[in-house]
Amino acid sequence: MTNNNSNSNNNQTISNLSAGLKSVNLADQQQNEVNLNLLQQQLQNEATTQQSQSRISQFFQNQPTEGYTLFSHRSAPNGFKVAIILSELNLPFNTIFLDFNNGEQRAPEFVTINPNARVPALIDHFNENTSIWESGAIILYLVSKYLKDNGECALWSDNLIEQSQISSWLFFQTSGHAPMIGQALHFRYFHSCPVPSAVERYTDEVRRVYGVIEMALAERREALIMDLDVENAAAYSAGTTPLSQSRYFDYPVWLVGDRATVADLSFVPWNNVVDRIGINLKVEFPEVYKWTKYMMRRPAVIRALRGD
């Protein structure tokens, strides 16, 4: 997000400078100096771009023969989402963080593996350098391949019905959760001019999305407590004893089944930045907060978010 802001500020500065120069009659010598400076800046930018693109070119000319290569960005939650799954599956991978300021995402070699020129993208060097783009597609590829190679995958399922439930939440995250937070961040921090109605609209939609998740997790918790806290189940059902008094009230619950899957873990990086749009998960969505807290403690998640 920071890089986008930097681009916006730079563009605005250049635009203001251009407008200012039009209103001033410069002497020939001064004009020549300005032209020279602009030319030097242009040449420097071109050299930097060639250097950055050559970094990508060099990689594609000498690709590894094993492991995975993840193309990401330091400010891209979707890239870290894929890194979490790679880490959870204990798969060997290397991350290349693209420099958007220098246009590395538009390098011809990168566009051949992701025509959308965005991150994340993944290359599987074990499988003839197969490339996959879009975070949801990458995740499904990884867990499906892991299941095929190992016979089981804790983050996925070999049951078609459970697979469809996991996929539903994964697609909900990629199509509803992430884009709404992304738009709320954009209009709050990076848009060229304030648009309060857009900020309100997207923030409200993020809250609606979290309401869906909160309800699902609350239902899972109630079922867990009623199943495990048998001696108090009648009191909970009658409403004479609140569920919050159960010793199982803080046990982890998951969207599908009794374990964390990609349905859960795909939400982590975006949950980690939602406070920047003024949403307090702990106060507004306590089940989502507890769920996120449990996932953030997982060693693989910690490694992935650190960029290890």
Swiss-Prot record:
InterPro entries: Glutathione-S-Trfase_C-like, Glutathione-S-Trfase_C_sf, Glutathione_S-Trfase, Glutathione_S-Trfase_N, GST_C, Thioredoxin-like_sf, Ure2. The keyword Protease does not apply. Plays an important role in the cellular response to the nitrogen source. URE2 gene plays a major part in the repression of GLN1 and GDH2 genes by glutamine, and is required for the inactivation of glutamine synthetase. URE2 gene product may catalytically inactivate GLN3 in response to an increase in the intracellular concentration of glutamine. GO terms for cellular component: cytoplasm. Pfam families: GST_C, GST_N. The keyword rRNA-binding does not apply. Belongs to the GST superfamily. This is Protein URE2. It comes from Debaryomyces hansenii (strain ATCC 36239 / CBS 767 / BCRC 21394 / JCM 1990 / NBRC 0083 / IGC 2968) (Yeast). GO terms for molecular function: glutathione peroxidase activity; phosphoprotein binding; transcription corepressor activity. Residues 66-150 form the GST N-terminal domain. Residues 159-308 form the GST C-terminal domain. GO terms for biological process: negative regulation of transcription by transcription factor localization; nitrate assimilation; protein urmylation; regulation of nitrogen utilization. Keywords: Nitrate assimilation. Homodimer.
